[in-house]
């Protein structure tokens, strides 16, 4: 098992289960309000020869006690002059920090959304409003939908909703289906994605592997 002192990247580190440090300033983990994370690997090919994978990673830590979130970026090598295994190691270090913080702060971040749900009747995520009865209101025009009428799919950074349309029973129905694309929406999940997935699993019975 990794000790908390191993969760360190440049000027950011997890000191223990209650404290993080950034640029020699310490913050309480209980004051974390949101976490953002993304890790992307890109295959690098030079003259048709596979050179390995270049990795990028991003971590955002929002705090009650800091006016601006903490941002940690590793943008990858973008060059053949570095061993690509090194880029994976650096990205994995940031991912390990995220996973540890996500574990330590999961309940308090869930409680933030549940508090809004209790007071407003919905929780807000990625500018959309989610109601326990299955209604979702997106910020775009005509953005009020019933989640049960949509197919959900997921990528590493987004959830997509695509309208489920009944199979047409007439020739004209088939023509109309080809002419009109199903309504679709996207929800970016890089911030508090673990919490969002837990909430829609609980309220909408939607889950992935």
Predicted segments, located by residue:
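Conserved beta-hairpin
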Residues: 1-36, 106-149
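Acidic, Ser/Thr- and proline-rich intrinsically disordered linker/docking segments
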Residues: 35-114, 148-209
